[in-house]
Curated annotation (Swiss-Prot):
E.C. numbers: 2.5.1.19
Classification lineage: Bacteria, Pseudomonadati, Campylobacterota, Epsilonproteobacteria, Campylobacterales
UniProt function note: Catalyzes the transfer of the enolpyruvyl moiety of phosphoenolpyruvate (PEP) to the 5-hydroxyl of shikimate-3-phosphate (S3P) to produce enolpyruvyl shikimate-3-phosphate and inorganic phosphate.
PROSITE patterns tied to this protein: EPSP_SYNTHASE_1, EPSP_SYNTHASE_2
Gene Ontology molecular function terms on file: 3-phosphoshikimate 1-carboxyvinyltransferase activity
Binding residue positions for phosphoenolpyruvate: 11, 82, 110, 157, 333, 385
Protein known as: 3-phosphoshikimate 1-carboxyvinyltransferase
GO biological-process terms attached to the record: amino acid biosynthetic process; aromatic amino acid family biosynthetic process; chorismate biosynthetic process
Amino acid sequence: MIELDINASDKSLSHRAVIFSLLAQKPCFVRNFLMGEDCLSSLEIAQNLGAKVENTAKNSFKITPPTTIKEPNKILNCNNSGTTMRLYSGLLSAQKGLFVLSGDNSLNARPMKRIIEPLKAFGAKILGREDNHFAPLVILGSPLKACHYESPIASAQVKSAFILSALQAQGASTYKESELSRNHTEIMLKSLGADIHNQDGVLKISPLEKPLEAFDFTIANDPSSAFFFALACAITPKSRLLLKNVLLNPTRIEAFEVLKKMGASIEYAIQSKDLEMIGDIYVEHAPLKAINIDQNIASLIDEIPALSIAMLFAKGKSMVKNAKDLRAKESDRIKAVVSNFKALGIECEEFEDGFYVEGLEDISPLKQRFSRIKPPLIKSFNDHRIAMSFAVLTLALPLEIDNLECANISFPQFKHLLNQFKKGSLNGN
């Protein structure tokens, strides 16, 4: 059995720990922070807003929040991180000062009206480019009034931005989403003293009566990162894998459940349950069968590109529907998956809210073909999840990816661990 402690701290928790520290009044400690480019953007902005950040150990920090958030004298650069931009928008909407949030070309092309509209419901003064559709965003912090909002999309980033504004508004606010998205924001903030309740799918958020409690968080491993290696195991004959110290929040393991339905053997062993469930995941290769994915999309949307690789190895036609938001990620992930598959000669087709893939079941003829002719270069579209998904496919096919370095955005250790997995599977471990 291959045993991996993937050493990829959870991206969602890392972002939130930094951003939430700014609503505390005492030093906070974040351990096992994800040192990927996205999370470092959140950390740098915290410093630009007046927080003092000190290294305490490897990948660990003491964050001393400012007494009041400082108005920066420069643009707050979110780089490629949508989480950074959207959550800081909620936080800063009620803070005194003028704040400008911008990012790289990819982030500035991603939809921002989805957060501007709920924040404006509070009375927030926030503007975006092209009639509020895109960043850069300009925020003039101002007093907020409670509101009641029903989101047309299930998005943890939209929900989190709303909650951060609601905590600073006058009066209790409510938020309803179309389906449950990841709930780390609610869990973490409640543990720090925020009054947040979920009743029949409606969140009620009361304003903070005092600063958040200081905290000492140790970040568990990211299930979205771990999933790439569950996929690697599922498509590699005779392989068995133990993934250690993984966050097992039910809103984060839907992709593992889908892979399990496809035929892979997957079991969980909970090791601790404090703030969040943490444990180990056992994965064993088994023949895969096709699947249709059209529910619980919000809980697995980040893993759909990786699941598309599993579909390639499955018997039958697999389908993804109700996943239009894939087109609004770091790349148009529907087009990215389908265009790469078509370049490889795979039968597939895209539609507005998804795609289908005709599984090969036996991939050896394609492997033989690419031993005779040079395979096409896989296009990452500078999207970390597209790059890593197709990198897993290189375990079975002799492919090259145009920019695997973009994995550093969320998973700096990915290439090293993929090589470890490859050596382990070749050695029969």
